[in-house]
Amino acid sequence: MDTEDDPLLQDVWLEEEQEEEEATGETFLGAQKPGPQPGAGGQCCWRHWPLASRPPASGFWSTLGWAFTNPCCAGLVLFLGCSIPMALSAFMFLYYPPLDIDISYNAFEIRNHEASQRFDALTLALKSQFGSWGRNRRDLADFTSETLQRLISEQLQQLHLGNRSRQASRAPRVIPAASLGGPGPYRDTSAAQKPTANRSGRLRRETPPLEDLAANQSEDPRNQRLSKNGRYQPSIPPHAAVAANQSRARRGASRWDYSRAYVSANTQTHAHWRIELIFLARGDAERNIFTSERLVTIHEIERKIMDHPGFREFCWKPHEVLKDLPLGSYSYCSPPSSLMTYFFPTERGGKIYYDGMGQDLADIRGSLELAMTHPEFYWYVDEGLSADNLKSSLLRSEILFGAPLPNYYSVDDRWEEQRAKFQSFVVTYVAMLAKQSTSKVQVLYGGTDLFDYEVRRTFNNDMLLAFISSSCIAALVYILTSCSVFLSFFGIASIGLSCLVALFLYHVVFGIQYLGILNGVAAFVIVGIGVDDVFVFINTYRQATHLEDPQLRMIHTVQTAGKATFFTSLTTAAAYAANVFSQIPAVHDFGLFMSLIVSCCWLAVLVTMPAALGLWSLYLAPLESSCQTSCHQNCSRKTSLHFPGDVFAAPEQVGGSPAQGPIPYLDDDIPLLEVEEEPVSLELGDVSLVSVSPEGLQPASNTGSRGHLIVQLQELLHHWVLWSAVKSRWVIVGLFVSILILSLVFASRLRPASRAPLLFRPDTNIQVLLDLKYNLSAEGISCITCSGLFQEKPHSLQNNIRTSLEKKRRGSGVPWASRPEATLQDFPGTVYISKVKSQGHPAVYRLSLNASLPAPWQAVSPGDGEVPSFQVYRAPFGNFTKKLTACMSTVGLLQAASPSRKWMLTTLACDAKRGWKFDFSFYVATKEQQHTRKLYFAQSHKPPFHGRVCMAPPGCLLSSSPDGPTKGFFFVPSEKVPKARLSATFGFNPCVNTGCGKPAVRPLVDTGAMVFVVFGIIGVNRTRQVDNHVIGDPGSVVYDSSFDLFKEIGHLCHLCKAIAANSELVKPGGAQCLPSGYSISSFLQMLHPECKELPEPNLLPGQLSHGAVGVREGRVQWISMAFESTTYKGKSSFQTYSDYLRWESFLQQQLQALPEGSVLRRGFQTCEHWKQIFMEIVGVQSALCGLVLSLLICVAAVAVFTTHILLLLPVLLSILGIVCLVVTIMYWSGWEMGAVEAISLSILVGSSVDYCVHLVEGYLLAGENLPPHQAEDARTQRQWRTLEAVRHVGVAIVSSALTTVIATVPLFFCIIAPFAKFGKIVALNTGVSILYTLTVSTALLGIMAPSSFTRTRTSFLKALGAVLLAGALGLGACLVLLQSGYKIPLPAGASL
């Protein structure tokens, strides 16, 4: 779809830094380990180092450390790191087409799947034949059917006349007169009714030779064609120069075009655009739209649409409306195509016009009886309505707009300009229509342009939440970086720059021109993911206070943090990249874009953050430290909790220097700590909380320099892990095993989706409209002439009996059931009130439409709130639509002291169980109107429970209950104003005498999936297509050159009958084997006996058959037969897949029964719905394959990173527990496994492994500096290393988890459903991951981790060899399975 939205994320790629990354990775493995320096004390992280004046030592790492700590070099790195991405993005925006937002369903189609290729082949064949393709194809060119008739005539002449000359054989190419009248009943009736029209049509049907038609198949030389009911139906002859634009015009055209539709003087005569309206009944249990209150509301809404500013400049103005005089005030604009044309007719000059412009509601039942005599009526209502059940839960309407617009010569004259004008106009309806829903009627609005506008607006509004997410994360980063503005700025900036790099790669390098709607998730997720790496770098740098030399400290930070973030970014990027193998373009693009962003984010942080940390430590750290120190001295108190001694350790310079030269650098892992502790006895598995500081170290006097919040968080984590990894580690492992078993049980119960996927929030206008499209009758048919304006002629008001022959031709329907006519008063009535007052008893009031006063009733005198009488309407009139019922009862009255009857008013039906019977009813207003007065009514809560009407509440205090059905107020016309003159259409019943005739039979209106059986087409050729995205060259059709229609005509007719007879697959009357027009079946039965009595489809008048043939160069090239399937389009893809298999197996059985050499054996069945179901089926399958692939990548990466099986095992167990628990929570939440859930699961493994890997990295670093007194006991070593690992990385991973959750929380409030669900899954997974890392992973490390293992180059090579060996064994196993015939599923939905 076209769009003008700017891209939300813009990234570029630093190609020059790839070599640096590779060099960094190689040096990771090749560097050597330094030895500890005796007597070296810890260095305060806030110390201001002097500038490095000496040149760097030889070696890559020394040069790198010097560059990042030299202010000039660090500043240059920051400048280049910011300027290069911005320069690349500027180059992209200036010299490449702008990125668009792809909101089309095409982005989710699997173009290489068999179902898609089949349907695309048919679509391309239809486009090449007719110029457009769509379910509505109202302007399907009749020249094809005429040409087919001519070919059949030639075949018949060759069969019966033998050798005739070529000139004689070409003579029948002028359509025979028999084809004009035809044997069909419609043709005879039309000819009888409109002889003039037939003569006119006969003159226009003379056509040029067949060669001319074949040369330009998209042109129709006829000026008009006669429709089945005698109306003229002009074709649309496009000009060759504007064929592309004209094809769009033809797609929206109907058979009700007019002879001068393309003459420049006839502005807006072509119905080209539309707004779809659906009115849903709500607010009561009955849900019937045909009530007076709801119909009046709908009529008011349609009038507001016509009164909207600018409507007359864009409305549809067909020539038919010129005969409707009341439409003159609207410049003869066509009213909405709606049943309101029957319910609100107008009267002018003694004639009734069914145009919906009247002010008064006609008789509802009589109007429905009149409308139901037309098959077109069923287009407006749901499938439950019938002659015996005049109720519908919804009502459809169409607002039509015409082209060409004023000041344009034709539709093709500056078409894009006309389209832009209409789009800017039509979106002004959104604000108005969004406010029209009431408590009784819900208004849904749609149409192509409005739908696109709604989707774009929804997407943009959801993207605004990303700015809220980024702002919250920026504030949190500021806090967690000890309120360092400098580090916070460059931390967030590095993420933004990575987005520019990734966007540059995505758009320029990979050549993708569109951002899919799923890519919007990146705006939320990447900030949370990218901040993880930022925290690791900052935390690692601050932890390395034991390194005095700033260069060594920077080298340690780059190596340690770079390695840890590399593996975590690798696993996360691999999890997203697993979706690249999906054949669904939207999922493929989402996986590619996210993997690029994660990779570029790691690279940007690797380059930017060391330089920022170098400048910060030289110049900004002392300033921030002094500010925070003064603030904390005044505002904070010291904590009473103990903390590991070296956290607060400040160096005390003894002898003037804490260090004697640089520490020898020997390996890539710098010791984390230089702490010597005295031996402490451990009892019951406890580890001493207080550690003895080495000599020369004392607790710092000010904790504010480290940030009070971070100190408290680190202290809390220390106590937490002391409990989980030492004291209660076996309890945690037991709970973990129990939860894992239960999770496996519940996760196995998660079922595939049972309904179509939600794209938007369920209560939104867009989603409700999409849901209804699965259930609506003829959701793809534009019935622009189904209203009473076109179906009914103006007729005299004095004669309500319809005598039109057009109505009598509707036979075979069920006659209306005999019923007494309900005679409603056509004028306002008066309700008279009288009363009986007995001593000692309350007054009882009588309500009557009769002014007489039988004894003992007495007239009510005005005053004291009494109301002698009031005016009412006996039928809905204007805003007087609230119905009140007067109920009468004799129960509970004493005959001696009271009258024999009592009355009450209610808004509901009379309660027969309590003795109340219906007396009469009337209509009032619920809001104050002009010239009205307000009255109150109530029912006594004491015997005899009678009712009363009065002027004010003090006189109606019969009940203290709140307003309800028997108590409240209403407005009635004021008696001082002259009575309004009711129009002649008020309560008008067109069927008041003998009725309107039989109701029409419900036609076939496309409620199921339309399946096409195609012959003569082999497939589609896309070899020349560059498949970067769904938008591009669709390819070309590959035809079957050996296909001969007349040779296979008998088999085709047999297949048509066989498929139509299968009631399990095809609906009754759903077979459309032939194209529309001119009784082709009467010719076919002469060619072969099998072609006699072909099934006839039951279509709407004007609805064209979906069957089609392709004619080229004087021969039939292909044919497609259409069948309305019993498949319900609202089912889930997994349920519908069984219907697809039934169709496929049945057709193959029929084709295999054909003769061996028949070309029909290459036929196939296809359906647009099959494309849709395979989107989700293959999407889920590819996502699950991606889950397995990402799991394998993560296992391999973690194995190489940890280099020990006992370190790999805790990580794998944690990942398994995390994924199973998340899936279990999804099951408990009532979710099902759809495409969104499967895609989310595929990235869970990569995001779950991050925190565990960081913890294992801390465990390995702690082993590099194991205290001597801990080296004796293996259990003590494991526990100490686990505690040190949490102390090292705990704050970083908790901060990362917190930012990730905050980044995804705004996704919860998105209207786009995949966004919201994706955000919930990511937030849930992040929460479970950090919880399992701090509990299960620490407990498992404290139990099974190797106590004295340290990572070496040898262990790395062994782990790498084991991974390669395992990969080779897995590949060999796959080959063995393939040789044995086992099929291995692939992400593309196929199998090996």
UniProtKB/Swiss-Prot annotation:
Subcellular compartments: Endoplasmic reticulum membrane; Nucleus membrane; Cytoplasmic vesicle membrane
Keywords: Cholesterol metabolism, Cytoplasmic vesicle, Differentiation, Endoplasmic reticulum, Glycoprotein, Lipid metabolism, Membrane, Nucleus, Steroid metabolism, Sterol metabolism, Transmembrane, Transmembrane helix
GO cellular component: cytoplasm; cytoplasmic vesicle membrane; endoplasmic reticulum; endoplasmic reticulum membrane; membrane; nuclear membrane
Pfam families assigned to the protein according to its UniProt record, in alphabetical order: DUF7023, MMPL, Sterol-sensing
Membrane topology type: Multi-pass membrane protein
Presence of the UniProt keyword Transmembrane helix in the record: yes
Compositional bias annotation for Polar residues: 190-199
Region Disordered, residue ranges: 16-40, 162-248
Glycosylated residue positions: 163, 1021
GO biological process: cell differentiation; cholesterol homeostasis; cholesterol metabolic process; negative regulation of neuron differentiation; positive regulation of lipid metabolic process; positive regulation of neural precursor cell proliferation; regulation of lipid transport; smoothened signaling pathway
Tissue specificity statement from the Swiss-Prot or TrEMBL entry: Expressed in brain and testis.
Primary location: endoplasmic reticulum
Signal peptide positions on this chain: none
Regions crossing the membrane: 74-94, 463-483, 485-505, 509-529, 574-594, 596-616, 730-750, 1183-1203, 1205-1225, 1292-1312, 1321-1341, 1359-1379
Cytoplasmic side: 1-73, 484, 530-573, 617-729, 1204, 1313-1320, 1380-1392
Induction: Up-regulated by thyroid hormone T3.
Lumenal domain ranges by topology: 95-462, 506-508, 595, 751-1182, 1226-1291, 1342-1358
Domain SSD residues, every copy: 457-615
UniProt record similarity statement: Belongs to the patched family.
The protein's role, per its UniProt record: Plays a role in neuronal proliferation and differentiation. Plays a role in the accumulation of cellular cholesterol. Involved in intracellular lipid droplet formation. May contribute to cholesterol homeostasis in neuronal cells.
Domain-related comment: The SSD (sterol-sensing) domain is necessary for the increase in cellular cholesterol uptake.
Descriptive protein name: Protein dispatched homolog 3
Lineage: Eukaryota, Metazoa, Chordata, Craniata, Vertebrata
